[in-house]
């Protein structure tokens, strides 16, 4: 049948991939299609393993078109120094911030990453954690259903810090939300709070339910861990 590729035929596969690269280049640079640029990145990463070129396309697509998922991936490149880029956490934070403000598959995770970097403090002018900014971006990601952000919020309210008082009620609220989203340690923390009546009314039955939920999540995570294979 015309148009179908026989993937057992090396020449057909080679021709197919070459055509794919040309098509993605055309979509990106001639048709000015940000999604075409992102497909070109997928091709460069997945087929050619050319991460230096992929970094250039990501930078172009993020800066020129503000493509959210490209900004997210460019931020990840800056975090590790991938694709020939100099490792730069401030640049990474800027990229994640752009992605956070844009619709996209990685928008919520980008907000979480902005929170993480603000919480860590290395990207801040004084090198100290910016707990207000961290809380704001964790909150956005948590509202978007990102479990790790909800858990981090619960930990912030659980521990407290200068200018950021402890609030066990909020700590429990965010632990419960993270637990509902499948975060095993959040379930364990919430269970303990209900068992002790710490920030909430003591409820041993609810504590037991949450403890069992934590156990079940842990069991599922262990089941999903792939064994190492050699040879």
Curated annotation (Swiss-Prot):
Sel1-like repeats: 34-66, 68-104, 108-146, 147-183, 184-219
Entry's Gene Ontology molecular function annotations: protein-disulfide reductase activity
SMART domains given in the database record: SEL1
Transmembrane segments: none
Protein's cellular compartments: Mitochondrion intermembrane space
Listed GO biological process terms: respiratory chain complex IV assembly
One Pfam family, short name: Sel1
Superkingdom classification of source: Eukaryota
Gene3D superfamilies membership: Tetratricopeptide repeat domain
One Gene Ontology CC term in the entry: nucleoplasm
UniProt function note: Required for assembly of mitochondrial respiratory chain complex I and complex IV.
Family: Belongs to the hcp beta-lactamase family.
Assembly information from the UniProt record: Interacts with CHCHD4/MIA40 through transient intermolecular disulfide bonds.
UniProt protein name: Cytochrome c oxidase assembly factor 7
């Amino acid at each position: 049948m015309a148009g179908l590729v026989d993937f057992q035929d090396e020449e057909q596969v080679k021709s197919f991939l070459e055509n794919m690269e040309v098509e993605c280049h055309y979509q990106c640079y001639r048709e000015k299609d940000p999604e075409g640029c992102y497909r070109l990145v997928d091709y460069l990463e997945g087929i050619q393993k050319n991460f230096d070129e992929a970094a250039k396309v990501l930078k172009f697509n993020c800066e020129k078109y503000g493509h959210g998922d490209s900004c997210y991936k460019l931020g990840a490149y800056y975090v590790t120094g991938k694709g020939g880029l100099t490792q730069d956490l401030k640049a990474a934070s800027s990229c994640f911030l752009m992605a956070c403000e844009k619709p996209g598959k990685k928008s919520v995770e980008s907000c979480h990453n902005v929170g993480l970097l603000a919480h860590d403090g290395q990207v801040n002018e004084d090198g100290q954690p910016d707990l207000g900014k961290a809380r704001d971006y964790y909150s956005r990601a948590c509202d978007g259903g990102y479990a790790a952000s909800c858990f981090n919020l619960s930990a912030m309210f659980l521990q407290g810090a200068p200018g950021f008082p402890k609030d066990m009620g909020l700590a429990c609220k965010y632990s419960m939300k993270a637990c509902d989203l499948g975060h095993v340690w959040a379930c364990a923390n919430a269970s303990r709070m209900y068992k002790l009546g710490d920030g909430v009314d003591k409820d041993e039955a609810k504590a037991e339910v949450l403890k069992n939920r934590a156990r079940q999540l842990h069991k599922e995570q262990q089941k999903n861990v792939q064994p190492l294979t050699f040879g």
